[in-house]
């Protein structure tokens, strides 16, 4: 453990409360944009992309192809983490965070004007995959910078709460993306929605980008980063991601294991179940679109509340509680789907994608960033977080759809997949030492 770097912090009196608030607000605003854009793709892939961009294959294969393009974004997230992390550790967090918002917004808006397969043939899916890769690259650099700036700027005993805006941005992004798709879906016919209605939410991203850039322009670099740069100005530096790998190789594996619960609970409910419930169960698409609205809205309240509890009672306790709730809800969720019981579908969707998910993500910012020294923290935490996204989340809808296809529509294998991921996260958190309070 690099005790010298990790324990080196600016005096608490130098931490400006106004700087902390601006960092929290800026991290939140950018996270809204990035997660709105990133999640919007998953929702639309479940409803539209199989027919608009892959019409030449069977419905089942079209669904797999659409979810595969969803996973492409995750493959490029580690690369974004490496590149943005490298320059973020050298040049500063703020510069990189301005650039990630620009890249994400432009890629998303271009998807909104992308011609379909019937217009330009195979160029349509090729360009779709390219733009999805740019989305993944941009969001790969977003989390590390936003998490670090908010954690490093926060008061010592309120780091989970002040950095929770990064994850609240996820909830607002989910709320906006699902809400806008749901609204347009209700206002258009199926033909209109498939033709042009789905494009409107992608173009709306431009408005969010301009707002986020205005907010982020008022942020400052954290005092901790500035002090670290001063101390190491004359030192010979290795590439930050290499430094992180050499000093803390086990931290990357821990982050992957810890994130399984979060990734599986969210993407199975918001992406896979949306497709599975409509195509296999005959349930209306509005059901899971409305569930996404509910989950996103509740997350705006529950994430900061759980973060406050974590600051008060310990991060690990809150984390383990969330993973156990996810474990216990896996099979009941699919049983409710099979029974087509709306009340229990909604209830267990909230237990998985809201309660379990939010108890886990609310403490990830301080938990993950404190595994690394300040001079390579953007690279270490960012790359670890994004590699976990590939391993645990990027192909979750694809894997779940493949399991359903392989087992002829039987959902038990997907429930086991979800349960196992939650248990792995629980065991990893149980074996960790709470860096704040056990």
From Swiss-Prot:
It holds the Pfam family MFS_1. Induction: The translation of shiA mRNA is activated by the small RNA (sRNA) RyhB. In the presence of the RNA chaperone Hfq, shiA mRNA forms an inhibitory structure that blocks the translation initiation. However, when RyhB is expressed, it pairs with the 5'-untranslated region (5'-UTR) of the shiA mRNA to prevent the formation of this inhibitory structure, which allows translation to proceed and synthesis of the shikimate permease. It is a multi-pass membrane protein. Gene3D superfamilies: MFS general substrate transporter like domains (1.20.1250.20). GO terms for molecular function: shikimate transmembrane transporter activity; symporter activity. Keywords: Cell inner membrane, Cell membrane, Membrane, Symport, Transmembrane, Transmembrane helix, Transport. GO terms for cellular component: plasma membrane. Disulfide bonds: none annotated. CDD domains: MFS_ShiA_like. The chain crosses the membrane at residues 28-48, 64-84, 109-129, 133-153, 168-188, 193-213, 255-275, 287-307, 318-337, 341-363, 387-407, 411-431. It is found in: Cell inner membrane. One of its GO terms (biological process) is shikimate transmembrane transport. InterPro entries: MFS, MFS_dom, MFS_sugar_transport-like, MFS_trans_sf, MHS_symport, Sugar_transporter_CS. Disruption phenotype: Disruption of the gene abolishes shikimate uptake. It catalyses: shikimate(in) + H(+)(in) = shikimate(out) + H(+)(out). SUPFAM superfamilies: MFS general substrate transporter. Belongs to the major facilitator superfamily. Metabolite:H+ Symporter (MHS) family (TC 2.A.1.6) family. Involved in the uptake of shikimate, an intermediate in the aromatic amino acid biosynthetic pathway. This is Shikimate transporter. It comes from Escherichia coli (strain K12). The lineage of its organism: Bacteria, Pseudomonadati, Pseudomonadota, Gammaproteobacteria, Enterobacterales. The gene is shiA.
